[in-house]
């Protein structure tokens, strides 16, 4: 898929929102990628996850994991495309954990997926969990990279689409100065 085809798909799915948003990282932005909308229709989710799975098809992935809630369906679909186990991590008492009988065996090759990467906070938490379990992180994958390729996880990071969307520290946000109400659309549950 070309970047322009992906942009058209994101527009059609009404994923890109404009306004004044509080991101899960605590930063503010004038644009928000509501990637959950991708997963309400297989017309969008299947080809985007297939695009990402294709980038890792030769890496002998054994497990695909994503943080709840945003990457549960994504981990499933990428895992399905790769023909491997898929699980998700949940935050419990402020820390990412494996529950529901999910496991990562020592030495298993793991792909971590996330719908949107802005600061990489949730991804880094899942990376720590995978390391604690003894898994080998082969790479990170996202549908949207909001950093425009600027983030470094220390392992290969590939996205279906990359877009540099500006975000601001709250005390430096020009949108706050206009008085436009702040909207918190995310679901990470971190204060």
Task: Spell out what each predicted region is.
Residues 54, 76, 80, 128, ...:
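Short, well-ordered alpha-helices that flank and scaffold nucleotide-derived cofactor binding pockets
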Residues 59-68:
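Short glycine-rich phosphate-binding loop at a beta-alpha junction
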Residues 3-9, 127-191:
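PRPP-dependent phosphoribosyltransferase catalytic core
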């Amino acid at each position: 898929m070309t970047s322009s085809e992906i942009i058209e798909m994101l527009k059609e799915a009404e994923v890109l929102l404009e306004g004044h948003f509080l991101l899960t990282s605590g930063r503010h932005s004038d644009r928000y990628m509501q990637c959950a909308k991708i997963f309400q229709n297989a017309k969008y989710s299947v080809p985007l996850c297939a695009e990402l799975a294709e980038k890792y098809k030769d890496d002998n992935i054994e497990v695909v994991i994503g943080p709840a809630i945003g990457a549960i369906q994504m981990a499933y679909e990428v895992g399905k495309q790769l023909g491997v186990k898929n699980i998700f991590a949940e935050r419990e008492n402020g820390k990412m954990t494996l529950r529901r009988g999910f496991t990562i065996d020592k030495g298993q090759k793991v792909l971590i997926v996330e719908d949107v990467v802005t600061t990489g906070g949730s991804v880094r938490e899942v990376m720590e969990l995978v390391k604690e379990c003894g898994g080998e992180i082969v790479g990170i994958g996202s549908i949207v990279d909001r950093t425009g390729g600027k983030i470094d996880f220390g392992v290969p990071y590939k996205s279906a689409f990359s877009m540099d969307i500006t975000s601001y520290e709250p005390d430096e946000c020009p949108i706050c100065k206009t008085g436009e109400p702040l909207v918190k659309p995310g679901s990470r549950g971190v204060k």
